[in-house]
Amino acid sequence: IHEEKKKLADMSLHVITSMYSALSAKIPEIDRHCEQTAAYSRRIAEGMGLDETACTNAYYAGLLHEVGAVGLPDEIIQKSSLTEEQYEIYQTYVSRGYRIIRELQIADEVAEAVRYHRGNYDGSSYLEGRSGKNIPVLARILSVADYADRHARWGETAEEISQKLEERKETRFDPECAEQMRAILNPADQQQE
């Protein structure tokens, strides 16, 4: 049974790698973004004292969180601002990613993190109205990690990102996850406290 699970995991990894190769043609830098988001996710999970399995799953969630974008039309992927109709289509990438990860039989915690990572901590998002601790912890971690890397890619400094995390904790972000990300971005600030 263990050997069969390993084969399935290897096949799933191969399928996902192939999907990301296709996605890289549409979205330059997707590999780097997912790798950095994965690294941030793991560090946040470690900083929160989660066990090794949860830390590993946080890493995989970061690595796989964009997989659902594979089915998005080019005109949506390549635009910085979207019409309301295009935004509705864009939002489907989260549920598509969730389904892909579930079908590949990757850990449920990873699939749930991908499914809910675009949800706001206060429940004001489009994702089933979940809020606070009802959002899976790995999704709350992934939300912060994805945000930080995305904004860094857009040219914001660590200080600017840290300030936005501070302003948005309790509304968009889990306060503990936001604080862990701020500590990663500004390690000297945390040592002074």
Predicted regions and their residues:
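Metal-dependent catalytic cores of enzymes that make or break cyclic nucleotides
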Residues: 13, 20, 24-193
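Membrane-proximal linker segments that couple transmembrane helices to downstream signaling/catalytic modules
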Residues: 8-15
